[in-house]
């Protein structure tokens, strides 16, 4: 970029040092420049009505201080720029004042009333243009001025401005207000127009060539005012010099606007994409809103419908329950009466039965006690008999032992006597120590024995001779006594036995008959024994009698049971049967009835089973249909939705498939039309893009070649031509319209051979790009084209092109046409794309419908089938209920028949007993016989043993053994005599044994020792025998004692048991019952039977009591249930009525608002209330979030939460629908249904997303193209600045010999341009980012390549927009050539006042000229604008400087209005002498106009 600056300086120097290049041809037509003709001030301070005619060059206002020069210039400036925000006349403003400066110096220059400042000008067309302002002071402290701008056209030249604005009233003139002025010209050719905006006023002045630039905004007016202000007060204005770029460099609105349009389009595109995303989210929110609101309301709607249906069903069920409770209550009351009657009967029977049971139980106890007593008696009898036997045995043993004791005692006594005798003999024998002594002792003993015998026997004459005789006599006598003793002993034994037998028999008789006299014992025993035989025979018959009685009692009991059963049967069967024939006939009848009932019941059961199977099948079908119904309703909703979307009525699945095929065909056709329109739109976009280029060229290589050759495209030189001239110039150059204008063809010729890539035909024209003229060809303009004479032999005819390459205005005009066409094509493309999207969506819906719902959508309505099934099921239920009642009756009949048959089965086997009337008598007779037999049996059992014992010894009772003591005494006496005789025999035997000893009378002395020894031996033997006898005695005594003790124990035990036996016999006699095994069994069976009957009665009574309690409780419950059922029914009925009112309101709302089909979602009818409430609650939670920002919907939703008013939910749904309807854009979406709108919105948003994405790709601009545009624009403006510098040549003010403009590219921006051109890949991250706009990316790149620069608080977008303006890339400075300093920067401090004023005026002229060039393409080609500048206080310029200004004005065809003191008199131009005078207390300015009164 430094090379560019150096090149610019070289070009500038060359231009200044070289002569100007002559144009290739002189223009054939010239346009005169417009001029300001006059300035008229009406009712200004000092000027009531004054017109200043303005010179074509310089108009000078000369006068002293206060003469009115500044007021005149203020009037001119006010008429030129009527903007109170800018006007500020400083030389009349109080210094340092704040409040008094509010009028900006204008208020004090006016007089009260209507004031005018009017400019009259003559434009290039020769039109008289009158523009001005009406001013009027506004009363108040603020010193405000009201300004109204206006214009007048077609005013004749003969009419002066003052005559137009005033009217003659007598000798005075009146200033016309604007309204009167307007009325004055109504209906005439004069066009009066009042402007309500300064922009319109300035647009009028620009169009007619009054001002050089179109002032579109307040910023443009500010620039213009600052330029006028700078020229007014003179000098180098720092405001202008600091912003020369804004004044001299055109804004290049086309490029900038293109960038801005591109950026705004991209931004709008992205914003639209974001808005689409937001809209999609809003759509999703709306979709969710409509979905959730539908779920919320429809779930509650269906729940209320279900609840209403359920409430009606509940009401019917409660009414049915009420009636059933009433019938149950009546039935239970009937049962209570029957059960109470039966309980009363059972209570009556229970007492008698209980008495019988107690009696039977007591009888059983007596029998059991009797049996126990009998067992004890038998046991005791056995024990007593055994004890008697033992006692007898013991008695015999005791007697034997007694005899043994006596024998042992006798033997012991004999042994003692013998020992004593032997001891005595021993003592005697011991006295003789020899045999003699012993014999003598024996002799003495023999003598002693003889004496003893004599003494014992009483035989004094006893001797050895008669001893044997006496011995024999006494032995015989002893034998007789022994026999007598034996006899007596036998008699005694017999007597003892007789006594024992008598005592025993007597005891037995006493035991049997009680205590009787001993003398009567025999008679009693005999009578007992006589009766005992019969009693034993009767006792043997007791068993048979007992068996017989048991049989009779059993039969009697069976007869009683049969009578009882018959009575019960007759009572239950309501009959009076008595005979067996009647019972058997009835039995056969009931058996046949049972078979019939069983057959009928089996048939009922079979029919019921069949009906239950049918009901089960129907239930299965119903459940299957109930499962299918929601899906079917969903399919129907989808089908209805699909029919609405397609606008078709589908009758079958084939029609859906056919429509789907047709939709595919339609989609292909729409796709082809869309693609065709897309290609047309792309072609138009390409043409628009080409025409949007600054040079209008469609070949990029031409720009590259122009830069390479240092030339300019011909189209750029004619870029500012007007719309009317553009076709002419395009046709004039023909194919050469793409030519490149270069300064020297020869210098370019050498480069042509080196070209690698260039167009097929490349046209080069030699000429100065800065002063190019169109007089190149000899041409003649025709109606439709131009005939160009290329040479004498070659003409070319070119028609006016419809789209001229030359002229930006023409291209822009055609661009408008192309854009309009593109918009139309884009709209058509959008419609076709919408149609394609719609077709695709419809095909998608169709595919989804076919895949999901086609199998169910055209099937029959499952609810109708469900209703039919429900009707069949109800009929079956009714039949089943009826069959259940019939079956219950049959079962009751069956149970009754079975019960009767069961009772008959019990009665019939006993029916023969009912006719046996003698059974009771026979039983009584048998019982009497059994009683006798049992008494005999009991007597035999009790006394049979005694009688058996008594029978063999009964004879002992004949005599009473009372002489037993005498016999015993005789026996003892005989025994004593026998003992004495035996002693005598023994003594005699001892004498006989000692008879030999009598012969020892001689040997008494010689046989003593032998005898002693013999005696000692005998004594020892005797002692041993005595010890043995004593031992035997002791043993016999011990045995006797033992036997006696045993006998005593047996006797006491026998007495005790006998006593116990007597007590048991008395007790069993007291019981009066004879027990046997059969009796116990009979008593027990009787007791058990009665117990069973009593238990049955009690259990039946307990059951009946429980049933009565249950029935009473059931009656109470049924009574409460009946009341509750009645109350619930009435409550439910009221609820149904209330719900019906609310439901009617809901239906009315939904039907009137056409939302019923949205709410009546039958697929929800099969869900439970909890599931529907869950759906509604979930939707409510989502809706609270969705409508949180919408107060109306939020309030409506809050009101809808009241469960008591379901209509509020419908109202909320209607509000949601209305809310969504209001937000449907009818220009885009052609429907009132929000759901359809959402569907269409999805299609449209999808299409817009695709379209905007592709548009963003088209709108994207490369950084390299931006750099090329900026470089090209900078180069063009540099060339223009060079051209402007030519107009400042030979300007001299004092020491200043030249003024020029220097334009340089800033280094930081040059680096940016290089980065844009060459760093494409390096900085790709910035320009390819979707988050950054191009301006922001450009600002980020600027910061990246210039990291040392602080951006401050400005945003990247602002910096980027500034970087898109080429003016920010350039630095403009004013340099002056002054003396020896050479070229230096123009500053007021380095110049004198005159030099500064001249230099500043030169700069201003350059600015005005630049504005004219900039606005040339916007102005008609036959108009050149007026040029006028001001200069107040020109006294600071010398005469030479003033002459220089005159020359400058003459050369640049410019007017100048200056104010000078009285001593300044320009040589040329018009001079007005202003003198302020006072006449008659009225102040006015006296004006005298002169022309060229200065020195020659």
From Swiss-Prot:
Basic and acidic residues bias: start-end ranges: 1082-1091
Coiled coil: 328-493, 536-632, 861-1171, 1235-1291
A Pfam family this chain is assigned to: SbcC_Walker_B
Start and end residues of each stretch annotated as Disordered: 1082-1101
Binding site for ATP: 63-70
Keyword Metal-binding tagged: no
Region annotation (Flexible hinge) ranges: 694-811
GO cellular component term, pick one: cytoplasm
Domain of life: Bacteria
Keyword annotations of the record: ATP-binding, Cell cycle, Cell division, Chromosome partition, Coiled coil, Cytoplasm, DNA condensation, DNA-binding, Nucleotide-binding
Task performed by this protein: Plays a central role in chromosome condensation, segregation and cell cycle progression. Functions as a homodimer, which is essential for chromosome partition. Involved in negative DNA supercoiling in vivo, and by this means organize and compact chromosomes. May achieve or facilitate chromosome segregation by condensation DNA from both sides of a centrally located replisome during cell division.
PANTHER family: CHROMOSOME PARTITION PROTEIN MUKB (PTHR42963), DUF4476 DOMAIN-CONTAINING PROTEIN (PTHR42963:SF1)
Similarity annotation: Belongs to the SMC family. MukB subfamily.
Subunit comment: Homodimerization via its hinge domain. Binds to DNA via its C-terminal region. Interacts, and probably forms a ternary complex, with MukE and MukF via its C-terminal region. The complex formation is stimulated by calcium or magnesium. Interacts with tubulin-related protein FtsZ.
Domains as described in the record: The hinge domain, which separates the large intramolecular coiled coil regions, allows the homodimerization, forming a V-shaped homodimer.
Name this polypeptide is given: Chromosome partition protein MukB
Species assigned in the record: Actinobacillus pleuropneumoniae serotype 3 (strain JL03)
